[in-house]
Amino acid sequence: EVYGLSGWVSHHNLDIWGHSGPVGYFGQDEDPCSYSMWPMSSGWLCRHLWEHYCYTEDLDFLKDRAYPVIEGAVKFYLGFLFPYGEYYVTGPSTSPENRFCGEDGKSHSVGMASTMDISILKELFGYYLKICNTLGIEGEKADVKRVLSKLPPFKTGSFGQIREWFLDYPETEIHHRHVSHLYGLYPGNLITEKNPELLEACRVALERRGDEGTGWCMAWKACLWARLRDGEHALGLLKNQLRYTR
């Protein structure tokens, strides 16, 4: 109803009443769009359904429970994406809670095709095609294949880091606790040792962010360092997370 599109979508906030639309302190926060305008949690949540099947190989679960939910999310994103040059992009788009310095020299949070958005969609569309093939269902395969082939590639920024946004904008908060642009490394599986250049770009991005953050952010960073085969760094973050506080 909010977007006038088919399928379903959820944002950063879910509650016991099933409300999943954008929620923010509009008129109070300086920039509520930086956290509320994020229609990508449905894509992330679908990943857990796919992982459940990968571990259990439960075809009944895949067909009866996972597929209908995942297909609904896919339908929404097929309608949400739009052509921009040679690519299909998301918009409005954010890298949750972080901001960038625009060409006008001002701080902004809303752009298009953030790296996190595209990473989530590449994974979602990828395993949707696998599900269709496994179940022998045509579904939205043709449109998904067409759009997937035109999603923007990962790009590196001026510091050798994975870009956070579609264009090489400088972030206004280098040490922001979120590492949304590294979703493709973890929890995703888009960036692996088969892509050494992208792995190094992830390392640079993670080093620029630093180790500080809230509890869940430290846990995410520990997982990212583990994916980068740096167990000592991951262990250091876990020890820091489990220390006594006063």
Model-based region annotation:
Residues 48-51, 70, 75-80, 186:
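Structured mid-domain segments that build the active-site/substrate or prosthetic-cofactor binding neighborhood
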Residues 72-131:
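Acidic/histidine-rich catalytic neighborhood
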Residues 7-19, 81, 112, 162-166:
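Generic preference for hydrophobic/aromatic residues in regular secondary structure cores
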Residues 14-37, 93-113, 244-246:
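Acidic/His metal-coordination segments adjacent to aromatic residues that form catalytic metal sites
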Residues 1-2, 8-9, 27, 33-59, ...:
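Active-site core of glycosidic bond-cleaving carbohydrate-active enzymes
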